[in-house]
């Protein structure tokens, strides 16, 4: 298969290099198109206000001065001279569990591939304090999942969000299909003073696990399993439709009231 590989940790990150090499070793034709620096937390942002510069690192690697979504969008809308068969994003150096997926550039790169018509997988290694030890485990999981997708494709609107515990392959207890859990509210932002005495802020850490019981992605990786969560991009809150529909009469009546 022709595999487009991207990430949000940047083109020089070890995770993407190990992933690309594992996919090549499995017989795939791999093109890496990734940000020229760390763009973690970029979510689905597209660069629309300035042109995007690219740099060929080698015949199989392109660095992009943009977001993960920019990378995949450019690659699939004319920058490459061929059409890939699948998008694989990662390997991220930290978890993308639960509502992390809303902010994740790793997941968003896969999501852009799905928007543009390709099967897509996001792969993250669940590290502690960003100290990664077993990228090879996550890469092997990605190779196995890509092979399964080729043999047994999923519906066209589905992205696979894969989280791999930072364990040796022989210590992983198995794969689990999971749903997204969620976290408590994020921790407070962190104020500091710059050298000129002005206040600057760092975004605070993610909140602790909240919905993290059996069946969730949090629980799977905590118990030594590789979590596979099928996700799609329909943000409709169906449970609220009837309640909001009950407002419509009053809202419509307000149109006839005084300005």
Swiss-Prot record:
Gene3D superfamilies: Survival protein SurE-like phosphatase/nucleotidase. Pfam families: SurE (PF01975). It catalyses: a ribonucleoside 5'-phosphate + H2O = a ribonucleoside + phosphate. Keywords: Cytoplasm, Hydrolase, Metal-binding, Nucleotide-binding. Its EC number is 3.1.3.5. Its cofactor is a divalent metal cation. It is an enzyme of class 3 (hydrolase). Its main location: cytoplasm. GO terms for molecular function: 3'-nucleotidase activity; 5'-nucleotidase activity; exopolyphosphatase activity; metal ion binding; nucleotide binding. It is found in: Cytoplasm. A divalent metal cation binds at residues 8-9, 40, 92. InterPro entries: SurE, SurE-like_Pase/nucleotidase, SurE-like_sf. GO terms for cellular component: cytoplasm. Binds 1 divalent metal cation per subunit. Nucleotidase that shows phosphatase activity on nucleoside 5'-monophosphates. Belongs to the SurE nucleotidase family. This is 5'-nucleotidase SurE. It comes from Xanthomonas euvesicatoria pv. vesicatoria (strain 85-10).
């Amino acid at each position: 298969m022709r595999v487009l590989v991207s990430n949000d940790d940047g083109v020089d990150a070890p995770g993407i290099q190990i992933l690309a090499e594992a996919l090549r070793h499995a017989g795939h034709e791999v093109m890496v198109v990734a940000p020229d620096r760390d763009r973690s937390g970029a979510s689905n942002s597209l660069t629309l206000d300035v042109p995007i510069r690219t740099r060929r690192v080698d015949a199989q690697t392109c660095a992009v001065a943009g977001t993960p979504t920019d990378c995949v969008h450019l690659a699939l809308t004319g920058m490459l001279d061929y059409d890939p068969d699948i998008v694989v994003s990662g390997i991220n150096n930290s978890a993308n569990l639960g509502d992390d997926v809303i902010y994740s550039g790793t997941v968003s790169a896969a999501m852009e591939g799905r928007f543009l018509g390709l099967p897509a997988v996001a792969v993250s290694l669940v590290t502690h304090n960003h100290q990664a030890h077993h990228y090879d485990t996550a890469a092997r999981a990605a190779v196995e999942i890509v092979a399964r997708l080729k043999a047994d494709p999923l519906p066209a609107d589905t992205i696979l969000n894969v989280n791999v515990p930072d364990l040796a392959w022989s210590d992983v207890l198995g794969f689990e299909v999971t749903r997204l859990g969620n976290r408590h509210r994020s921790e407070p932002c962190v104020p500091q003073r710059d050298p000129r005495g002005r206040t600057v802020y760092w975004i605070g850490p993610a909140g602790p696990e909240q919905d993290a019981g059996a069946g969730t992605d949090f629980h799977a990786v905590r118990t030594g399993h590789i979590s596979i969560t099928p996700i799609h991009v329909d943000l409709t809150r169906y449970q609220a439709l009837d309640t909001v529909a009950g407002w419509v009469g009053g809202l419509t009546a307000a149109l006839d009231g005084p300005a």
